Amino acid sequence: MKNEPHHVSTENILPDKQGVASFGTTDSSERVTYFQAEDVLVSNIRPYFKKMWFATTSGGCNADVLCFRALDKKYAYLLKSIMFQDGFFDYVMSGAKGTKMPRGDKTHIMLYPIPLFSETQLLKFIEYNKISFGEGGRMRSLSRVSRKQRYSTLDFPAENRVPTGMQNSPESIKAFAVFDVTFNIYS
């Protein structure tokens, strides 16, 4: 695995949810979590920097980068949109351990309250993302608008949130973290 061309560490991910600057390298002695396109990678060191990347390719990341994946790819953008909210990073910081270089607590992160969506809302969200990002790529015409501006319009009211461990979710819309902890999205 020496010189993996798509290796991501906390140093490669840009602050304020701006993606990844470049890819690093690793050697065979480093433990690597493999990620796929449309996974959400989040730096777990100093979560207040809000380092997040919605992967556009596959590769590997080190243990300081958390990798989240929607089990059903059609919900990948929904997962990204939920995690893109500043409230997600505020929540991570509320359970972080350490003062000089705080780290998110994986168990705490997996209890992040996820909005409840009706089937109609889920279908509208999926259709919007087909138009915006995939089929036709209309979002490219909005390239002058920052990612932060585009996603700040997605509001997930607090009254529609439930802790992830409190309900069973349909198998089709579950997501999981690649570090072997379940992360559920409920409908």
Predicted feature residues:
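Short coil/turn segments at secondary-structure boundaries
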Residues: M1-H7, M93-A96
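Sequence-specific dsDNA recognition surfaces
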Residues: N3-A37
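Juxtamembrane/interface motifs at transmembrane-helix termini
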Residues: H6-H7, T99-K100, L111, L142-K148
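Active-site donor-binding loop signature of nucleotide-sugar glycosyltransferases
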Residues: T10, A70, I114
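A short beta-sheet element
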Residues: T33, V40-D86, K106
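A short glycine-rich beta-alpha junction/loop motif
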Residues: I45, G59-L66, K97-I126, I131
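Periplasmic-binding protein-like
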Residues: F88-Y91
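Amphipathic alpha-helical coiled-coil/heptad-repeat segments
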Residues: L116-S187
